């Protein structure tokens, strides 16, 4: 019985961590699939959004949910401006140029936050209703983790419906599958790029705030978890919302279990598995087969 409770707790913890990975990574998957742009600054938008949420709660007295909305909107708006002013100039550049630009942008984000706020971890105070534990029958588990799982399910359901049942979702899917054909059908690709990039960055900000309780929130966040976000995208497939969801859950649970039983080598094991997977299926587990 004790073993069953321990397994259930680990699975719940891994699923909750996977939800955070999904919320942050889904925007990166869609923007990379749509734009073909290697955006290593995505973790930076998650970090900046998390800071916006934490500071809005701490200094302006915003509640948790309004602060999440604030962080999403501010980050999405700022990223839309950056996309038009800077990113758009590099869409036809080499991948090396894109990598150098975005990694330089990350270093600027880290340096700016460190200078203005400091290098310390930024606490994010949860409301009382999300603290404590909830009875799940076989075990007691943190209320916030359970809520986070529910929020993740709601988000993936909403995104799936948005991509499958709305006009802009159809346009994004068409552009991801065949950009030239989408352009020939009259789809405004530049406008679509800006909207998608802003939304993806806003989702990263939301994940940065929601996941601060698990991952912490400091200036190095922008680089610290970047590899995990890229792994989720690689395993889930570019532009695949449900693929990223399943990949995030898989990586979240695997990471949680391995760090408990193999704390010194768990992360390295995930890296090795990812390399082997991509050698076998370069498009990822859930990506469309490359022809």
Where are these regions (language model features)?
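Cytosolic-side transmembrane-helix boundaries in multi-pass membrane proteins
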Residues: 6, 85, 116, 177-184, ...
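Alpha-helical transmembrane segments within multi-pass membrane transporters and channels
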Residues: 61-106, 112, 246-251, 281-282
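Hydrophobic core segments of alpha-helical transmembrane domains in multi-pass membrane transport
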Residues: 50, 54, 72-78, 105-114, ...
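Membrane-embedded helix boundary and interhelical linker motif in transport proteins
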Residues: 12, 34-81, 85
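Helix-loop-helix "hairpin" substructures at the membrane interface of multi-pass membrane proteins
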Residues: 17, 139-217, 241-246
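Membrane-interfacial amphipathic/re-entrant helices at transmembrane-helix boundaries
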Residues: 1-23, 52, 64-67, 93-99, ...
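Transmembrane alpha-helical segments in multi-pass inner-membrane proteins
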Residues: 21, 25, 61-73, 194-274, ...
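Transmembrane helix-bundle core of multi-pass membrane transporters
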Residues: 89-90, 94-165, 192, 262-264, ...
């Amino acid at each position: 019985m004790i073993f069953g409770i321990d397994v259930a707790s680990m699975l719940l913890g891994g699923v909750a961590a996977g939800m955070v990975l999904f919320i942050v990574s889904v925007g990166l998957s869609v923007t990379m699939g749509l734009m073909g742009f290697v955006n290593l600054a995505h973790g930076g938008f998650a970090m900046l959004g998390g800071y916006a949420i934490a500071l809005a709660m701490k200094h302006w007295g915003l509640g948790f949910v309004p602060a999440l909305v604030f962080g999403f909107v501010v980050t999405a708006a700022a990223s839309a401006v950056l996309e038009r002013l800077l990113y758009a100039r590099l869409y036809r550049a080499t991948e090396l140029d894109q990598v150098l630009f975005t990694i330089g942008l990350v270093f600027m984000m880290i340096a700016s936050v460190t200078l203005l706020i400091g290098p310390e971890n930024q606490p994010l105070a949860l409301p009382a209703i999300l603290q404590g534990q909830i009875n799940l029958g076989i075990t007691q588990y943190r209320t916030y983790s359970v809520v986070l799982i529910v929020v993740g399910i709601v988000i993936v359901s909403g995104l799936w419906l948005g991509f499958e049942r709305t006009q802009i979702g159809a346009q994004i899917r068409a552009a991801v599958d065949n950009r030239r054909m989408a352009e020939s059908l009259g789809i405004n690709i530049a406008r679509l790029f800006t909207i998608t990039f802003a939304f993806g960055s806003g989702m990263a900000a939301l994940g940065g705030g929601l996941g601060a309780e698990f991952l912490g929130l400091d200036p190095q966040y922008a680089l610290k978890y970047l590899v995990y976000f890229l792994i989720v995208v690689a395993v889930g497939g570019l532009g695949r919302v449900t693929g990223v969801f399943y990949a995030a859950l898989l990586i979240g649970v695997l990471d949680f279990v391995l760090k408990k039983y193999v704390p010194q080598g768990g992360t390295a094991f995930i890296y090795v598995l990812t390399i082997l997977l991509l050698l076998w299926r370069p498009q990822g587990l859930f990506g469309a087969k490359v022809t």
